[in-house]
Amino acid sequence: MDVYSPTWFGLFMDAIDAAQTAREVEFLARQLPLPRHVRVLDVCCGTGRHAAMLVERGYDVMGIDVNERAIAQARSALAGRATLLIHDMRRIEQLDGSFDLVLMLWQSFGQFDDATNLDVLRQIARKLAPGDRFILDIYHRGFFETRLGTRAHEKLGRTITESKRLADDRLVVELDYGDGTGDRFEWRVFTPDEIAGLARQLGLHEVLRCAEFDEAVSPSPDRARMQLVFEKC
């Protein structure tokens, strides 16, 4: 499983502005109208940036993440307004109860081998009743097929060297922070049809695919991420 370092959080996650999160939550709310979808499971919730805004809108949120630093930050920010647990997504079935909605945002899916990735989806499907929804925000494989190699860029005054390569269907990203530290991440990456087909096997019917958290924007190899909304049959 990928483990995000404190340096990564400081450079990439903590730097996300509230306006971006608000746009993403507006999309989620359009796809999850209250009161039909109230109880939300936010898988890999990170620092709770989506959970906080969803709670403000009246959703009952449980967030899980394996990163203790992220959960501690989320608990501090939400101050008891959501249930936030240090919990592995591979054990979703151990969580109490069911949910009206499961979220998996910010390229959190695909960290494991194909069998384990499928089992994570299977556990999510089992936590949903017919008519409940699952929203997935992941990388579009086509985007990275033409953007591999090594480049250096500036982020918050630091020079980061980023290397990307594809190994079969897996994207490998290595970050060098220039101070002897770095991060390495690896994910199975999909086309829209591939991930929709995988979900279909588990009784999750696709109701929307888009990009930029905008229903009017279609997924494209020109855009790094895509969002898919599934409904339990």
Residue ranges of predicted features:
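C-terminal lobe and adjacent flexible extensions of AdoMet/dcAdoMet transferase-like proteins
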Residues: 194-233
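SAM-dependent methyltransferase
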Residues: 115, 131, 135-198
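Class I SAM-dependent methyltransferase SAM/SAH-binding core
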Residues: 49-91
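Conserved class I S-adenosyl-L-methionine
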Residues: 1-38
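Class I SAM-dependent methyltransferase "Motif I" SAM/SAH-binding loop
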Residues: 44-46
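A short glycine-rich, Lys/Arg-flanked "PGG" loop and its adjoining helix->strand segment in the class I
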Residues: 118-130
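A short acidic, Gly/Pro-enriched loop at the edge of an enzyme's catalytic core
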Residues: 94-101
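Residues lining the SAM
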Residues: 105-106
